[in-house]
Amino acid sequence: MWPGRGHVRDPEYVFQEQKKGIKPMEANNENPIIQLVGLGKQFQTMNGPVTALEDINLEIRYGEVFGIIGLSGAGKSTLVRCINYLEVPTSGKVVFEGKNLSVMKDREKRLARQSMGMIFQQFNLLSQRNVLQNVCFPLEIAGVSKAEAKKRAEELLTLVGLEDRMKAYPAQLSGGQKQRVAIARAMATNPKVLLCDEATSALDPNTTKSILELLKKINREMGITVIVITHEMAVIEAICDRVAIIDHSHIAEVGNVSDIFSGPKSDIGRQLILGDVAEQNLNFGNSRQIRIIFDGRESSEPVIANMVLACKVPVNIMHADTRDIEGK
């Protein structure tokens, strides 16, 4: 659901950016666009308070694709809703572009929030409006003229590959097409950050791949910071630069995707990345088990054969797989 009138970035500001051709944000991987400092969130229930988040400390950099992963109930969706203040944190602070959201006036907070587009697992399209009208909707709320809103919506629908479906209604679209409309709508007001809460969970693998490629294209070509919330490691390895693993309301570990995949330090990290292999209780007596990682497109050196010759011990390969992480 979109907020009411006045809850969108000022139309004059939005279209100054558009008319001047200014990209929402240039990539700068050294500085944070979002900082979470000691963030906590509790919900009050009939049985007492329930802690959803506790002492969350994160920095998300300009222009990166940042993943937040965890099992169901870990707190990841609450975290993303605290980032844009759809949920008000119980403790700690959210700093957006150097400004603390918790001390902002309501108008400033609304403008900051509208610099963060959001897409969900459920597409939340308006069934009585066609594709073009759905994308125009947030601009209409902002008081943007119909002509300007239509022009912006047409540009975005072309970007997401739906230029031939503008007059179609949500009921006539596939799941992937609906999510593309939702992405276009989330970008209507030129956000600096795109929050994706389980955006591919309801899609089939091929459609998921195409949506992830679209998000990466938006990140690469427009410089928009993308935050991906998911429970699927395949999504993280396909699109993200860095990742935070959340477990039982806490951050378990944070790092570059390649580093986390190569050597997860937390129990939940090993569970998510290694899966069944980490849980196997293999009994080989005093034999050692060694994990070998080839970091690159190919390995021409016969490492296993050389190990056998050098150590003069037999070697069994118990498990092997290949993954494409950061193009490697």
Region locations from a protein language model:
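C-terminal boundary and immediately downstream tail of ABC-type ATPase nucleotide-binding domains
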Residues: F261-I293, C311
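A short, surface-exposed alpha-helical micro-motif characterized by mixed small hydrophobic
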Residues: I236-A238
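ABC ATPase "signature
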Residues: V254-G255, G263
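Non-catalytic connector elements of ABC transporters
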Residues: W2, D10, V14, F284-K328
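Conserved H-loop
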Residues: G223-I229
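ABC family nucleotide-binding domain
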Residues: E30-N219
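ABC-family P-loop ATPase nucleotide-binding domain
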Residues: W2-Q42
